[in-house]
Amino acid sequence: MKKENWQKIENVYLLGKKIDKAKRMANKGESNTNMLSTEENIVKAKAVSRKKPVDVSYAGLARHESHVDTDYHGQALNTDNQDPKNYQARSFVKENELYESSQDCGHSRLAQILSEENQIKRLPQSDNTTTERIIENNPNYSNKPSKLKRALSGENSVFSIHQRNTLSPSSNLPRIPSDLYDIKQFLENLDARSFKSDMDLKRSQNMRRRATGYPAIVVPFLNGSLPQADLPPLRTIEDIDNLTREQCLTFIQGYGIPIDSSDTVYLKEKLRDAIGMRAFTDMSFEMNSFHLESPR
């Protein structure tokens, strides 16, 4: 074989090593756009002009140098043979082309976005009427409705926030008394629930004490206060039976018990249940009518 052919084969071999190195660098995520040699670019250009797949394998580069379809040993090469190495090389070149085209598209898209951003920044801070006029007169709004519409909506939102921060305090001044009244009512209801829980707790304690024969404890009224000093303490069922009608009504009103004006003996029974005297001896005790005056 002539010396020139050996030199061509050696050049092809070195070029193949460069391609393998570029493929390894591509797998590692490194830049490989400058690793393709001049001979490979020539092969790609001719293949694209003929609308044929690019063959950057060792054999394809050898055919480009010698213009003969031969392999490394000078034997005739079957062009229909789909070598996996050739397929990988073509895929590698195609990925490079897509990468370069995507970079170009990315730069152009970035420039377009920056241009739209500058245009949005130049928009005047105005009301919705001015914003609608800008939308109608802007030729890019029909092409890019979502971006510009979101930007203008954001402008209106900022203006609304400014209005709320500056105008809302003055407009809310008339509502302050009603808000304070609502807060006061809430606190009062909270206190009432707390007093009701305290009364129920003392009532439960009396039920346990009376079941074991102990006297009852004083149960606070529904408003949280204790019975007045002029009222007798209710320790046993006899204390309830000795109450006058006025005293019994005072206790019943303090505990928030609904009554009927015609009730007589039932008032004492309701008071007995309200303070927790539910033992067997208490329930079986027969109460008398009201005394005309408190016992001395």
Swiss-Prot record:
GO terms for biological process: meiotic cell cycle. It holds the Pfam family Mug135_C. GO terms for cellular component: cytosol; nucleus. Keywords: Cytoplasm, Meiosis, Nucleus. Its main location: cytoplasm. Belongs to the UPF0612 family. This is Meiotically up-regulated gene 2 protein. The gene is mug2.
